[in-house]
């Protein structure tokens, strides 16, 4: 059997998520959260995140196949619409005739983070809404972060009557690379008895003056 917990700590202008897990048999553990963000705010309908400006601290990403499973390749972002090493809006290249964006119907890919050292809490991504000036920074101890641009949102109704059409939210899901058990060269995600899985992800918020 296995046991897992996650602790949410709300601070001034920040949300910290701490994950822990133990097991009595070897098991794969790759925890994350699927929080959706729109820094422009919600409405009916909620606007797309196409104008959000994103930076991701990653030189490589994991390409996917036609059913969104990683192929096992680790590919350079350089020279492709996947490159967010310098700030770009989400919408700038999301509709390019690039096979990876076609497979994902937009961005739905794991970025291989440039880590200072294994397990260090580093800045993974920054997201900014230029109209409101709201900024979100994502820090994590994980090796990767999945960028998802709400490609399959279909107009469902959320809190306060807000509706969410396609691409009206963005996710930064800190995690080990998806499908790691089937890709031996990906970072190991197997938890052994006697060990404890630990992960920290921090979302920091600010408003540009």
Regions found by a protein language model. Name each.
Residues 9-16, 28, 47, 120, ...:
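Coil-to-beta-strand transition motifs
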Residues 1-8:
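Short, small-residue-biased leader/transition segments that mark boundaries at the very start
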Residues 79-209:
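Active-site pocket scaffolds in enzymes
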Residues 43-101:
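A conserved active-site cap/scaffold subdomain adjacent to cofactor or substrate pockets
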Residues 26-31, 67, 74-76, 147-149, ...:
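A short, polar/proline- and glycine-enriched secondary-structure boundary/capping micro-motif
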Residues 20-26, 57-61:
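Short, solvent-exposed aromatic-acidic interface loops
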Residues 6, 15-23:
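Short, well-ordered beta-strand segments enriched in hydrophobic/aromatic residues
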């Amino acid at each position: 059997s296995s046991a897992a917990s996650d602790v949410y700590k709300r601070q001034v202008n920040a949300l910290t998520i701490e994950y822990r897990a133990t097991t009595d048999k070897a098991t794969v553990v790759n925890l994350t959260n699927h929080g959706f963000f729109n820094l422009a705010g919600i409405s009916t309908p909620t606007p797309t995140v196409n104008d959000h400006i994103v930076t991701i601290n990653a030189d490589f990403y994991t390409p996917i196949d036609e059913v969104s499973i990683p192929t096992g390749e680790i590919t350079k972002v350089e020279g492709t619409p996947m490159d967010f090493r310098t700030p770009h809006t989400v919408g700038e290249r999301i509709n390019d005739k690039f096979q990876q964006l076609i497979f994902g119907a937009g961005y739905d890919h794991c970025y291989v983070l440039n880590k200072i050292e294994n397990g260090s809490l580093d800045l993974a991504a920054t997201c900014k809404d230029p109209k409101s000036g709201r900024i979100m920074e994502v820090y994590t101890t994980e090796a990767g972060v999945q960028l998802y641009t709400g490609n399959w949102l279909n107009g469902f109704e959320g809190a306060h009557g807000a509706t969410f059409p396609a691409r009206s939210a963005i996710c930064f899901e800190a995690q080990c690379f998806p499908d790691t058990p089937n890709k031996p060269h990906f970072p190991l995600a197997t938890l052994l008895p006697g060990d404890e899985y630990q992960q920290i992800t921090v979302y920091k918020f600010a408003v540009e003056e």
